[in-house]
From Swiss-Prot:
Keywords: Isomerase, Metal-binding, Plasmid, Zinc. This is 4-deoxy-L-threo-5-hexosulose-uronate ketol-isomerase 2. NCBIfam families: PRK00924.1. The keyword Metal-binding applies. CDD domains: cupin_KduI_C (cd20491), cupin_KduI_N (cd20294).
Amino acid sequence: MTASHIDYTIRYAVDPAAAARMDTDALRANFHIGDLFRQGRISLTYSHYDRMIVGGAMPVDKPLALETIRPTGTARFLERRELIAVNIGGPGRIEMNGESFRLEPRDMAYAGMGEDVTFSSEDPAVPAKFYLLSAPAHQALPRRHIRIGDAKRLDLGSAATSNERSIFQFIHPEGVKTCQLVVGMTQLAPGSVWNTMPCHVHDRRMEAYLYFDLDDSARVLHLMGEPSETRHIVMAREEAVLSPPWSIHSGCGTANYAFIWAMAGDNIDYTDVEMVPMETLR
């Protein structure tokens, strides 16, 4: 039985031909994830793309335990999984098997297979918002806390191409070890609005984006689909989107923003992508 403070939905895999025939409502029903952060609750979306779970936990006046859900088929949530939690709210804490870590805004924690996890906020008036990413694991790896200042930083793009940005790699082959999760954050500079353009696909990994750090009235037009058959989904702040392995994943905002990207699949090689020539986009 699912705990009373946890809600979950299931998203099945969609092939590119079916996605090309979808209208706006169908695209959003299959790929868009909203309502992630609700006070006192954990909201989870179980995706059949590489069995990735995308979710949000927003503890307020009491801790929230990450308990199992039916789709995992296990007695404990992380019995055969690993987890990454990124805090995009006020200061909070994550407890893993009795060890507590304080997460400032934009800090990350990794929980390996077999851990029991609980989330809490330091100040109920400014609650933490933990963005959750979980994928199947084959071995237990050490729990870790990575501060945003300790992440591997790359400054790329330019104002001339409207894509000046800083990339923060939380998980990478030279850093924290995971079974298959790869997670990072990109912050666009003021005046820059484009992400991941020129675009690419990676058939061996799915990806999920969480857009945040933008005003309530701002939007990001997230581009998806096969390069020759693109579609868009309009994204508001603190909303996520699933990207199948066959799909591009790019976006353009009405103002600058930040987003958290996460991948799972056959490998953790950032360079294992197929670039899409601009002239083939339609």
